[in-house]
Amino acid sequence: MRLPGRHVLYALSAVTMLAACSSNGARGGIASTNMNPTNPPATAETATVSPTPAPQSARTETWINLQVGDCLADLPPADLSRITVTIVDCATAHSAEVYLRAPVAVDAAVVSMANRDCAAGFAPYTGQSVDTSPYSVAYLIDSHQDRTGADPTPSTVICLLQPANGQLLTGSARR
C-alpha cells in the first residue's frame, strides 16, 4: 500500500530481548481549599472543593511499553541506540502521539502488515483519513522473537502520528 509522500510510513524496529522496565510511581496532587476561620459557615453544611488534578509530569519509559494515547516529547533514534522516550501530557508540545498497538507476525511482510494496520487504525482514533489529515504516520516494531511458533503474531506494531509539517503537536489528536 502506498500513501502520499507526506504520509510516508517508516519503521524503527528492534529485537527486544530484555525485560521491559516500567515505573509504577504513584502520581499525587496537592489539594487546597480556601477557608476563612474568622467567618465560619452559618449552617452545619460545609462546602467541599474537589481537588484540581495535577498536570501529568513528564516521565521516561522504554518505548516498548508505550500505550495508546501516550504523547512523546522525543522519539528513539532510528538506530535504537536509546530505548527510552519521554512521555508528556498531550496538552504540552510534543513530537508524536501513540494511536494504535497491534500484534503482527514477524516475516518478510512485516512492513506491509505494519503499514496496513497503522493505516487502518488511524481514522478510528482521529476521525480523519490519513490522506486528508495534517499528520504523517510512523511506527515502531517490538519484535518479541517467539521462536517456538506458539504465537503466530509475536511482535507488536506501535503506530505513531506526527505533524506532517515537522512542527510540534499541542493537544491530543484523539477524537
Curated annotation (Swiss-Prot):
Domain of life the protein comes from: Bacteria
Membrane topology: Lipid-anchor
The entry's keywords: Cell membrane, Lipoprotein, Membrane, Palmitate, Signal
Chief localisation class: membrane
Residues spanning the signal sequence: 1-20
Lipid-conjugated positions (S-diacylglycerol cysteine): 21
Covalently attached lipid (N-palmitoyl cysteine), positions: 21
Keyword Transmembrane part of the UniProt annotation: no
Compositional bias segments (type: Low complexity): 33-48
One Gene Ontology cellular component annotation held by this UniProt entry: plasma membrane
Subcellular location: Cell membrane; Cell surface
Record region (Disordered): 31-56
Prevents bacterial uptake by a human macrophage-like cell line: annotated segments: 61-80, 101-120, 121-140
Role according to the record: Probably involved in bacterial recognition and uptake by its host (human).
Record's comment describing the protein's domains: Fragments of the mature protein (residues 61-80, 101-120 and 121-140) prevent uptake of M.tuberculosis by a human macrophage-like cell line.
Name the record gives this protein: Putative lipoprotein LppN
Gene: lppN
